[in-house]
């Protein structure tokens, strides 16, 4: 995510307000149907035996493949970073992600490519596969039209697996966790929460914004400022250590 505020709030264990989530429900239903369809398939391919024996058959598709990506350590234990790959194509060493989206997202992807969040998610899936001893060569994202009558408007995107964005995201999350712990140890949880409140939100769009205790007032959330202590300059300057966006050309 490019939303530092939401990432820090999640790492700090803030309670998130749950609301009726109709669009995510639609996405969940589509994912479950695809899982059922691909798990019924019998596609196989053969791989050579390492000991010189007969080649053996391997199932090509695995839906909802669980992977452990890494962990973020802090004062209150650690966060295990894990997830499920919507579909893994073992023959082509490719992760496949279904995105059920509206026309605006599809137009944006056509114009600008997949968002940072989607690319980092794909990178993390590949890292998780490599942690399991599986190779990952490609990442694919299928943008499926939520509002169309057919899949004619679907947009498949495929690119080479790159572990760097995922490693950057994990390192950034650990840095935020370290700063949260440092502030809490030195000045307490209220100051820690004030620092989280001061972090920038997404410059584009974030589905989690508006669901945390400090932004229940939406665009009027700045009225909540007086419930937090004033941030010392050293903590405000620490915000400058954090990057919202991954810049490939600089790495």
Q: Model-found features: residue ranges?
A:
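Mg2+/Mn2+-dependent nuclease catalytic core
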Residues: 58, 62-180
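Intrinsically disordered, low-complexity coil segments
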Residues: 46-57, 71-77, 108-112, 183-200
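Metal-dependent nuclease catalytic cores that hydrolyze phosphodiester bonds in DNA/RNA
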Residues: 1-94, 248-251
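Short linear functional motifs in flexible/disordered or boundary regions
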Residues: 15, 42, 46, 99, ...
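A residue-level signal for conserved active-site and pocket-lining positions in enzyme catalytic cores
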Residues: 3, 125, 209
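Short, charged/polar micro-motifs that form catalytic or ligand-binding hotspots
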Residues: 16, 20, 24, 111-119, ...
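Metal-dependent nuclease catalytic regions and adjoining charged, substrate-binding loops involved
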Residues: 128-251
């Amino acid at each position: 995510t490019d939303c530092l505020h939401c990432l820090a709030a999640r790492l700090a264990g803030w309670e998130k307000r749950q609301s009726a989530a109709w669009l995510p429900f639609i996405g969940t239903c589509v994912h479950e149907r695809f899982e059922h369809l691909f798990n019924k398939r019998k596609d196989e391919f053969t791989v050579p035996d390492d000991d010189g024996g007969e080649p053996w058959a391997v199932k090509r598709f695995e839906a909802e493949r669980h992977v452990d990506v890494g962990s973020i350590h802090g004062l209150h234990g650690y966060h295990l970073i894990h997830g499920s790959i919507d579909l893994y194509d073992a023959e082509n060493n490719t992760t496949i992600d279904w995105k059920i989206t509206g026309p605006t997202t599809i137009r944006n992807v056509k114009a600008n490519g997949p968002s940072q969040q989607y690319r980092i998610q794909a990178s993390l899936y590949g890292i998780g596969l490599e942690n399991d001893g599986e190779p990952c060569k490609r990442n694919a994202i299928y943008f499926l039209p939520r509002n169309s009558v057919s899949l004619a408007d679907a947009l498949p995107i495929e690119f080479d697996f790159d572990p760097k964005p995922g490693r950057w995201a994990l390192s950034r999350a650990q840095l935020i966790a370290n700063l949260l712990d440092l502030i809490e140890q030195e000045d307490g949880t209220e100051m820690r929460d004030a620092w989280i409140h001061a972090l920038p939100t997404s410059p584009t769009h974030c589905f989690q914004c508006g669901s945390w205790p400090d932004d229940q007032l939406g665009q009027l959330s700045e009225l909540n400022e007086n419930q937090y202590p004033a941030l010392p300059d050293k903590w405000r300057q620490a915000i400058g250590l954090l990057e919202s966006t991954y810049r490939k050309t600089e790495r």
